[in-house]
Amino acid sequence: NRRPFLKKTRIPTVTMDTLHMGAVVTVYSRQLKIVEYGDAHTENAFSLARQSTLCVVKPGAVHLAGKVINAAQRSGFAVARVKMASLSRDDAADLIRSSSSSDPSGVAAELATGPSVGVALVGDNAVDSFKRLVETELVPALGDCVWCADSAADADAKTSAYFAKPASSRLSNTSLAIVKPSAIANLGLVMDAVCDAGFAMTGAASFTLDRVDAVEFLEVYKGVVPEFAAMVDELTSGAFVAMEVARSEDGGSGGENGVVEALREACGPADPEIARVLRPQSVRAKFGFDKVRNAVHCTDLPEDGELETHYFFKILQA
């Protein structure tokens, strides 16, 4: 019997950036989680080339998270996970324990002052490489805005501890922006564009959806837009980042502020080609490819703002 049992094939959405421990990749509509190396040779080849590290954007610098992520992505790091979370003083002290900080008590106190943004990064010799990036680029350009793991021995444990915390969210007078799987390579730029458009990030987390959940979330578009099936395919093609945002001028205080309409305008028309004509400075005009891979999903109707943020930051977090 000479019929082939296994055959190599190329999956466009599966790239080297997506292959690391804990990643979820989609192959022929099936979501597969990478839980172990296939053999010792693969483990040896990937152990340094796909090393992971943790970066925490400090509470006072959350508005700079997009710039930090963009700097990391430009330097060759892949973003594995993102979460905005609040740490207690004890949580923060545990996180930085054994780090080389000259003022661990002060750093712990700073990390406990409000929500921070944790970013799990993957790259070549990631721990040392990101420390160099912080020293040579981030601190000179943005100030002392991040804390990062400084030991490969405990980077994974610190990442697991941070991402075990519940995601921060306000769940009131906010809107939802999803950086789609096809735009994750530009995650930092997209997040920065949203913040520059007058929004403050009040929650953020990475997600992967199976087809049932994606259909449920996008059901309002079923029978309304011809691209519905393709929209579901896009949302289930890999990890994405959901952002809860409020108007910057609120200072996180809430209030009836038209945040849904304002975010929809900042994102621009669903078709990037139209967006580039009508709203050339919009997020979709800058980062979208087509009506499906248009960089971001945003809440369309004011009455859905609370529903969509609850779906990701309460229901899926339960």
Question: Model-predicted segments: where are they?
Answer:
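Non-catalytic terminal and connector segments of soluble metabolic enzymes
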Residues: 24, 44-318
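Extended amphipathic alpha-helical elements
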Residues: 1-47
